[in-house]
Amino acid sequence: MKKRISMIMFICLLLSLTACGVNSGTNSNTEPSATQSQAETPPSEPAAEPTEEAAKMLVVYFSATGNTKAVAEEITRLTGADLYEIVPAVPYTDEDLNYNNNECRANQEMNNASACPAIGSEAMDVSSYDTVFIGYPIWWGTMPRIINTFLDMYDLSGKTVLPFCTSGSSGITQSVSDIRAAEPDADVRDGLRASGANDSSIENWIADNGISE
């Protein structure tokens, strides 16, 4: 009987020692794992500072014969600006542009200070633009009346406005004065008269106004 009790006690002691060994092994395996996990977790990086949004530019132009269009496209190429063509609701024909005929459409419009030729181009939102180039041919010493229509339709207050024109001989000074009168709250800069898209003064004028792509 004593031998049986001793045997049972020996077995219980053996099982107890085995259980302790298992627990000890488990603890030794899990603790380094937690330490390794903490070591591998990279520190959080500070949030990036928001960058200033680049100024948006728009080139607006009216071109009766294609000369002003070529200059407008060159300015767009040099600056990366968006391009918008002012298209008359009623296109101008060759007869409309026959300045030798006092009754031609262009002459009649320029002789009427209140003339407001309709624009057929799709309306656009200019509010997001900081700088607006405005191009046109010179008619009767100033800009065509359809440019007045554009200025009546869109508020350029607070924007930088850069007029440019194409002309064989007439200057741009009067049209710049007219734009300043129409947009008194805009920063209307001195304009550029270009002979064509290859005119080297285009790039110089853009640079002089502190504009780059």
Describe the role of every protein-language-model region.
Residues G21-D130, G141-M143, D152, E203, ...:
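N-terminal beta1-alpha1-beta2 submodule of the flavodoxin-like/Rossmannoid cofactor-binding fold
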Residues D187-E213:
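Glycine-rich phosphate/pyrophosphate-binding loop and the adjoining helix
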